[in-house]
């Protein structure tokens, strides 16, 4: 059996794979910059080689549609699923974290949010959304972030309907005497030890693939390249979306997130041309072929090294 196939099968079987999560990864990575729509049969064809049947796909699509993440249209007996406005908005928000090439720059300022008069349920929901955006809880009603823009946070608060119940402050970096205490507080409030462990697990899972891609280069078919890319982004996404993406100045020494990101970039650059061609071959929309990726697709990870000639060689 091919070494790459063995790796792919091991990655699929290592942990339980949620259908809704995997297909969310597929839409975000392969379809969101190509119109966001695809025929159900095409999705089944893309995932068949990973051992996921049509029932798996149908169940996941049904749930994503029910959650308002996907829209569905039917032409005859065919069903086409596309990203809804909600799905596209959440996808764009996520990809700003997933495809970063480096830690965010920092001007030394902190954004502080103090919540007032919110019931426990609403407060818990707002805190969950803010934590996803990189905030940490300094106190039960006080959230802080060193890297969020006020305009983005205000949009989130308005969407949640709590803008009138949250007071926003801006603060400068603490004085030099406070830095040791600050680092300790940051590590605790942002759960950096647990985040670092998740990155280490990702590295252990995908680092063996780097030499395999060199040793078994002739085994890298477009289908295998797509499967590798999907699994890579799926598992990386699960880790990086929990990362607050703190500035370099606030991270502990030997932060595994740097290694994990570079590992992901290196593998992604290697398999992307063939994976892109495979999606083009199998993908079908309600009006025919999938459109070519938009320009933002090629800006991922600081810029993808994909030439048109490299894509064409996999479609011949």
Residue ranges with predicted function:
Residues 120-215:
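Mid-protein regulatory/catalytic core that forms ligand/cofactor-binding pockets
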Residues 52-63:
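Short amphipathic alpha-helical interaction segments
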Residues 2-29:
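Short alpha-helical segments that sit at the start of domains
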Residues 180-316:
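C-terminal regulatory/effector modules of DNA-binding transcriptional regulators
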Residues 68:
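Glycine-centered, phosphate/nucleic-acid-interacting loop/turn motifs that mediate DNA/RNA or nucleotide
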Residues 74-80:
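Short, Lys/Arg-rich nucleic-acid/phosphate-binding segment
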Residues 34-46:
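Short acidic, hydrophobic short linear motifs in intrinsically disordered regions
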Residues 96-138:
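Amphipathic alpha-helical dimerization/coiled-coil segments
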């Amino acid at each position: 059996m091919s070494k790459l196939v063995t790796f792919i099968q091991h990655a699929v079987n290592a942990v339980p794979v949620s259908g809704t999560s995997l297909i969310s990864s597929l839409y975000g990575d392969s379809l969101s910059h190509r119109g966001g729509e695809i025929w159900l049969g095409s999705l089944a064809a893309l995932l068949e080689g990973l051992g996921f049947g049509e029932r798996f796909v149908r169940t996941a699509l049904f749930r994503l549609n029910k959650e308002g993440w996907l829209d569905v249209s039917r032409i005859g007996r065919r069903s086409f699923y596309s990203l809804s406005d909600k799905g596209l908005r959440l996808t764009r928000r996520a990809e700003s974290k997933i495809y970063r090439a480096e830690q965010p720059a920092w001007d030394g300022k902190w954004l502080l949010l103090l919540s007032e008069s919110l019931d426990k349920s609403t407060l818990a929901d707002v805190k969950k959304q803010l934590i996803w955006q990189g905030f940490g809880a300094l106190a039960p009603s006080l959230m802080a972030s060193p890297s969020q823009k006020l305009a983005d946070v205000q949009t989130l608060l308005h969407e949640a309907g709590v803008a009138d119940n949250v007071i926003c402050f801006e603060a400068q970096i603490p004085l030099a005497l406070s830095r040791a205490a600050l680092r300790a507080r940051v590590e605790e409030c942002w759960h950096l030890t647990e985040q670092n462990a998740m990155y280490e697990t990702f590295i252990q899972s995908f680092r063996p693939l780097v030499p395999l891609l060199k040793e078994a280069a002739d085994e890298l078919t477009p289908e295998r390249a797509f499967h590798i890319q999907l699994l890579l982004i799926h598992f990386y996404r699960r880790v990086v979306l929990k990362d607050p993406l703190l500035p370099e100045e606030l991270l502990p020494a030997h932060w595994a997130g740097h290694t994990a990101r570079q590992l992901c970039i290196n593998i992604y650059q290697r398999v992307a041309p063939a994976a892109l061609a495979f999606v083009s071959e199998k993908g079908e929309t309600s009006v025919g072929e999938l459109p070519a990726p938009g320009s933002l697709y090629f800006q991922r990870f600081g810029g993808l090294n994909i030439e048109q000639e490299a894509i064409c060689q996999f479609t011949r």
